[in-house]
Amino acid sequence: MVSFTTLLTAVATAVSAVTASPLEALKRGIQPGTGVHDGYFYSFWTDGRGYVDFNNGPRGSYRVSWSNVNNWVGGKGWNPGPPRRIAYNGTWNNWNVNSYLALYGWTTNPLVEYYIVEAYGSYNPSSGAARLGTIEDDGGVYDIYRTRRINQPSIIGTASFDQYWSVRRQKRVGGTIDTGKHFDEWRRQGNLQLGAWNYMIMATEGYQSSGSAEIEVRSLD
């Protein structure tokens, strides 16, 4: 039997939810960090400027909104993240702001940050980089790039490291990615070496922008 005290508590909770301020609502998302939720690894990082409300959903899904950020990135996937075929879908309507939707991950020894970019907004992440080759995957063409980061945040702290990129010419929000194909072509066409597998997530990233996304990822292997 439900007690009167329990009913009062439920009513108070409901009223509190309705009357919560926007700032309080922002606090309901998870804190920056990494972990496992419903069988999937997640990572959420922010440099602390602006607001990011990141929420894990069932299985490989998450939803996020951000406002006036400097830089943040987060998503769900696997750790470790060896080569695999993945499928993803969702909503990402950040075409007019600086944001990426990408399969994102890291390796160590060597320390490498990599992106397989499916969609981007107002800024092309390959701007200013030399193209090393192309990859065909799931009916689209990706251009391969390498950039270098000096004394920047990484999974081992502040460090210098290479970034490897596959940037899809035909932007999209939904499809499949054969990560092994990208990794092989990075080595073959650009002599881009990867190390020990760290995490791999289907990520949303925002830079000096506001936006939102709802994404789900799953493995096909």
UniProtKB/Swiss-Prot annotation:
Catalytic residues, chain numbering: 113 (nucleophile), 205 (proton donor)
Transmembrane segments: none
InterPro entries: ConA-like_dom_sf, GH11/12, GH11_AS_1, GH11_AS_2, GH11_dom, Glyco_hydro_11
Statement on biotechnological application from the UniProt entry: SDS tolerance is important in detergent and textile solutions, and XYN11A thus might represent a potential candidate in these industries. Moreover, the alkaline-active, cellulose activity-free Xyn11A with a high specific activity is interesting for the biobleaching of paper pulp. Combining xylanase Xyn11A and xylosidases Xyl43A and/or Xyl43B leads to the release of reducing sugars as high as 1.29 folds of the sum of that released by each enzyme, which contributes to the formulation of optimised enzyme mixtures for the efficient hydrolysis of plant biomass.
Glycan attachment sites: 89
BP GO terms, sorted: xylan catabolic process
Single annotated GO MF: endo-1,4-beta-xylanase activity
Main location: secreted
Residue span(s) of domain GH11: 28-218
Alphabetical UniProt keywords: Carbohydrate metabolism, Glycoprotein, Glycosidase, Hydrolase, Polysaccharide degradation, Secreted, Signal, Xylan degradation
Location of the protein in the cell: Secreted
EC number of this enzyme: 3.2.1.8
Temperature-related activity annotation: Optimum temperature is 60 degrees Celsius.
pH dependence: Optimum pH is 7.0.
Pfam families linked to this entry: Glyco_hydro_11
Gene Ontology cellular-component annotations: extracellular region
Catalysed reaction, written as an equation: Endohydrolysis of (1->4)-beta-D-xylosidic linkages in xylans
Activity: how regulated: Retains an activity of 52.5% in the presence of 5 mM SDS.
Signal peptide positions on this chain: 1-17
Recorded metabolic or biological pathway in which this protein acts: Glycan degradation; xylan degradation
Top-level lineage group: Eukaryota
Function: Endo-1,4-beta-xylanase involved in the hydrolysis of xylan, a major structural heterogeneous polysaccharide found in plant biomass representing the second most abundant polysaccharide in the biosphere, after cellulose. Is an alkali-tolerant enzyme, exhibiting 50.6% of activity at pH 9.0, and 26.9% even at pH 10.0.
Membership in a protein family: Belongs to the glycosyl hydrolase 11 (cellulase G) family.
Protein name in the entry: Endo-1,4-beta-xylanase 11A
Organism: Humicola insolens (Soft-rot fungus)
Gene: Xyn11A
